[in-house]
A protein has these predicted regions:
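Intrinsic disorder/low-complexity segments
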Residues: 3-54
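N-terminal nucleotide-binding beta1-loop-alpha1 segment
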Residues: 52-71
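Short beta-strand/loop segment that forms part of the nucleotide-sugar
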Residues: 101-110
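Conserved donor-nucleotide/metal-binding helix-loop-beta segment in metal-dependent transferases, i.e.
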Residues: 165-189
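Short, glycine-/small-residue-rich phosphate/pyrophosphate-handling segment
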Residues: 202-222
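Short phosphate-binding loop-to-helix
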Residues: 118-154, 215
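A short, N-terminal amphipathic alpha-helix
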Residues: 83-102
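Conserved alpha/beta core of the MobA/IspD/sugar-nucleotide pyrophosphorylase nucleotidyltransferase superfamily
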Residues: 218-279
Length: 279
């Protein structure tokens, strides 16, 4: 998806991160299904009947200073960047609460045992899993395949870099999947913030130049080559740099689409650093 979903070293985080589910680094792990957090395993998906439910899988990093939003530093300090990232993750989870007929998973990096993720799971009764794969494409392919192996009728993968991602995006994606094989939510930098499907689509993630502005175009070309019909959501701006923050707040001034938590953090950061530029 958009930029969230790249392997999570600080070095990679500083590069342009188009084409990942705005969220977090990807850890390598065994090629089995994502493990659920122990307290949520029992009784998971009790309403699941004949593939009637969907899955939303949010890719996220733990908000560790120096490991997230590094392309905003400077002007932000590492702890400010981590605070912003944590707000984005929490709001991404909370904005799924109104959805019905879906189970919510949080795909975690560096791992689902991190206290930040355990707290979110306990508070919102979401399911946790690890990101599994050597690169972004493998992680997304694994997550989708695991969802379908569990019997879900469709699965949507998203990141956490789109502050105004809301229920309408998920509802529109689900509607598009009724007549398409794949749905993508483009970002303005050439990546995507959401990818959804009704069945495994490994072709979509093969030989993609992750962290470039070619991700969306290459992904659509792979889909076309595989005979997959693609539906597109409206494009959105993700937050990778402080210039993105400035631009987003200008654009949102009339729309008022920001959740309160992230909105407060962004406005505070603008007050502190509004005229600053990277050194």
């Amino acid at each position: 998806m958009s930029r969230s979903g790249n392997a999570g070293s600080s070095r990679r985080d500083r590069r342009k991160r188009s084409g990942r589910p705005s969220g977090g680094p990807h850890r390598q792990g065994p090629a089995d299904e994502p493990a659920l957090s122990p307290e949520l395993v029992e009784g998971a998906c009790p309403e699941l009947v004949e593939g009637s439910k969907g899955a939303i899988i949010i890719f996220a990093k733990a908000p560790a200073p120096g490991e997230v939003k590094t392309r905003m530093c400077p002007p932000l300090a590492p702890d400010e960047a981590a605070s912003l990232h944590g707000s984005l993750v929490m709001d991404a989870v909370e904005r799924t609460r109104s959805l019905r007929g879906v189970d919510i998973f949080l795909a975690c990096s560096p791992g689902m045992d991190h206290p930040f993720f355990q707290t979110l799971a306990a508070r919102h009764r979401i399911r946790l899993c690890d990101q599994v794969g050597a690169d972004l494409g493998q992680c997304m392919d694994h997550a989708l395949t695991a969802a379908f192996n569990r019997g879900y009728a469709h699965a949507l993968l998203v990141g956490t870099d789109i502050p105004n991602l809301a229920a309408r995006h998920y509802q529109r994606a689900k509607a598009l999947l009724q007549t398409t094989d794949v749905v993508l939510g483009p970002t303005e930098d050439g990546g995507y913030y959401l990818v959804g499907a009704k069945h495994p689509v490994p072709e979509l993630f093969a030989d993609i130049s992750w962290s470039t502005g070619e991700v969306l175009a290459q992904s659509r070309a792979r889909a076309d080559r595989a005979g997959l019909v693609v539906g597109l959501l409206d494009p959105e701006r993700d937050l990778d740099t402080f210039d993105d923050v400035r631009a987003f707040l200008r654009e949102d001034a009339g729309r008022k689409t920001l959740p309160t938590r992230t909105g407060n953090v962004l406005h505070t950061l603008i007050q502190r650093h509004g005229n600053s530029s990277p050194e």
